[in-house]
C-alpha cells in the first residue's frame, strides 16, 4: 500500500493508458474502462496544472492539422444520407480514438515511465503473438488472431511494430530492459506470423525491416550480419514449409485466389461509389449499407464489410474532401518527423514515422486500419510515447 499511495497522478495516468493498450484486444470493455479513467485523470491533471502546463510544440502543430482534418470530414457526417448514423460514427472513429495521443503528450513526461510503458506493452504483445501461434497449431483455427478482434488486426500491429523493434535493438538510446522486451516481442512475432498466416505481414515486414535498419547497418558491419542472418533464418524457415510457400506465392495470384479477387471487386465498387459521390462520398458509417444495396458486384460473394484499403475506402465513404483531410493530418506527422530525423538522426522521430507509415500507409493498402479501434489507439500510443521520449 505504501508504494501505491506514493504514486503520483502522472504515474496513475501512465498505468491506466498502459492497461488500456494491453487489454484493448483481449477485452474491449476492459480497455474502454481504463481508457475512460485515463481521460478523466488527465482532465484533472490538466486543470491542476492549468497555469503552467507544458504543451509540446508537436502537439500545437498536429492539433492544427487534426482540426483541419475534422473540418474536411464533417460534411461527410452531416450532409449525406443519414446524419443519425454519420455523426455518431464521426465521433467514434475520428474523435474518440485519438485522446490517448493527447493524454500521453500533455500528462506524461518522465522518461523512465515512458520507457516502462513501452516495455510492458512489448511483453504483452509477445504473449498476444504466442496465443495466435497456439490457436493455429492446436487446430483451433486456420489463422490465429491472438487476444481478439480480426486476424488482420494483429497482422497490422506486426507490420507497425516489427520495424520499431529493430530500431530499438539497433540504437543505443534505449535502455537494456526496453531492448530485452523488444527482443522478446520480436521473437514471439516470428511464431505469431506462423500462426496468423497473413501474407501482408510477411511481405511488408521483409520490405520494411531492411529499410529502417539501413541507417544502422551502414555504420557497423556486425549489424549487416545480424540483420541478414535474421532475415535469412526467417525466409529459410518458411521456405521449408510447402503450405507457406504456396500461400506466399498466392500474393500475385489475380485469377483464382478468392481473397485477392474479393479485394479487386470491392475496390472497384468503392471507386464506383466515389465516381457517383466525388466530394463527400456516401457518408461516414454508411459505406457498407450502400455497398450491399447498390454497389456490390455479383462476383463478390464474401459480403465484405469494407474496402480492405484505407484510401479506396475513404474515397467511397468521405470523398475527396475527407481523403484530403486525412492525408494532410498523417502526412504532416510524417514530414515533420522526417525533417527532425534528418537533422538529429534520433531514433524517436524515426519510430514515430514508422508507426504512421506502416500502420496507415503500408498495411493500409490491404486493410482498412483506420477503422480498427484497438489498432489505431495502439498506433497513437506508440506515436505519442516516442515523441515524448524525444522531447524529454
Question: What are the functions of these language-model segments?
Answer:
Residues 1-88, 107-119, 168-180, 390-392:
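Transmembrane signal-anchor hairpin modules in multi-pass inner-membrane enzymes, especially those
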Residues 254-268, 276, 280-318:
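Long extracytoplasmic/lumenal interhelical loops at the membrane interface
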Residues 14, 37-45, 351-365, 369-392:
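Transmembrane alpha-helices of multi-pass inner-membrane enzymes
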Residues 29-48, 90-102, 153-162, 203-210, ...:
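Membrane-embedded alpha-helical segments of multi-pass membrane proteins
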Residues 191, 195, 213-256, 268-276, ...:
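A membrane-periplasm/extracellular boundary helix in multi-pass inner-membrane enzymes
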Residues 84-88, 142-151, 196-201, 304-309, ...:
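Membrane-interface catalytic loops of GT-C/OST-like multi-pass glycosylation enzymes that act
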Residues 317-336:
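Selective detector of the "anchor" transmembrane alpha-helix that sits immediately C-terminal
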Residues 19-21, 74, 99-100, 112-140, ...:
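Alpha-helical transmembrane segments of multi-pass inner-membrane proteins
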Amino acid at each position: 500500500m505504501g508504494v501505491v499511495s506514493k504514486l503520483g497522478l502522472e504515474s496513475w495516468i501512465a498505468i491506466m493508458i498502459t492497461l488500456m493498450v494491453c487489454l484493448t484486444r483481449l477485452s474491449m470493455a476492459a480497455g474502454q474502462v481504463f481508457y475512460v479513467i485515463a481521460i478523466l485523470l488527465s482532465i484533472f491533471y490538466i486543470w491542476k496544472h492549468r497555469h503552467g502546463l507544458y504543451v509540446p510544440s508537436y502537439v500545437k502543430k498536429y492539433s492544427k492539422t487534426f482540426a483541419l482534418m475534422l473540418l474536411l470530414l464533417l460534411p461527410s457526417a452531416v450532409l449525406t444520407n443519414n446524419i443519425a448514423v454519420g455523426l455518431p460514427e464521426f465521433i467514434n472513429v475520428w474523435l474518440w480514438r485519438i485522446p490517448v495521443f493527447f493524454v500521453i503528450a500533455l500528462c506524461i513526461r518522465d522518461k523512465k515511465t515512458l520507457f516502462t510503458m513501452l516495455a510492458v506493452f512489448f511483453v504483452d504483445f509477445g504473449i498476444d503473438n504466442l496465443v495466435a501461434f497456439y490457436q493455429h497449431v492446436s487446430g483451433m483455427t486456420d489463422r490465429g488472431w491472438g487476444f481478439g478482434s480480426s486476424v488482420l488486426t494483429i497482422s497490422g500491429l506486426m507490420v507497425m511494430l516489427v520495424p520499431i523493434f529493430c530500431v530499438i535493438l539497433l540504437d543505443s538510446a534505449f535502455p537494456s530492459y526496453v531492448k530485452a522486451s523488444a527482443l522478446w516481442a520480436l521473437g514471439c512475432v516470428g511464431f505469431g506470423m506462423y500462426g496468423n498466416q497473413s501474407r501482408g505481414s510477411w511481405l511488408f515486414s521483409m520490405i520494411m525491416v531492411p529499410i529502417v535498419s539501413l541507417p544502422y547497418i551502414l555504420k557497423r558491419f556486425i549489424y549487416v550480419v545480424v540483420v541478414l542472418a535474421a532475415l535469412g533464418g526467417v525466409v529459410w524457415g518458411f521456405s521449408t514449409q510447402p503450405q507457406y510457400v504456396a500461400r506466399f506465392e498466392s500474393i500475385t495470384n489475380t485469377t483464382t485466389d478468392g481473397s485477392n479477387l474479393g479485394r479487386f471487386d470491392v475496390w472497384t465498387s468503392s471507386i464506383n461509389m466515389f465516381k457517383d459521390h466525388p466530394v463527400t462520398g456516401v457518408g461516414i458509417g454508411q459505406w457498407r449499407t450502400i455497398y450491399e444495396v447498390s454497389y456490390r458486384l455479383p462476383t463478390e460473394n464474401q459480403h465484405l464489410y469494407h474496402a480492405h484499403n484505407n484510401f479506396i475506402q475513404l474515397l467511397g465513404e468521405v470523398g475527396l474532401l475527407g481523403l484530403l483531410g486525412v492525408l494532410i493530418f498523417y502526412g504532416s506527422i510524417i514530414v515533420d518527423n522526417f525533417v527532425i530525423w534528418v537533422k538529429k538522426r534520433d531514433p524517436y522521430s524515426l519510430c514515430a514515422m514508422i508507426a504512421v507509415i506502416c500502420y496507415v500507409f503500408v498495411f493500409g493498402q490491404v486493410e482498412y486500419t483506420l477503422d480498427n479501434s484497438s489498432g489505431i489507439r495502439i498506433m497513437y500510443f506508440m506515436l505519442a510515447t516516442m515523441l515524448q521520449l524525444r522531447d524529454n
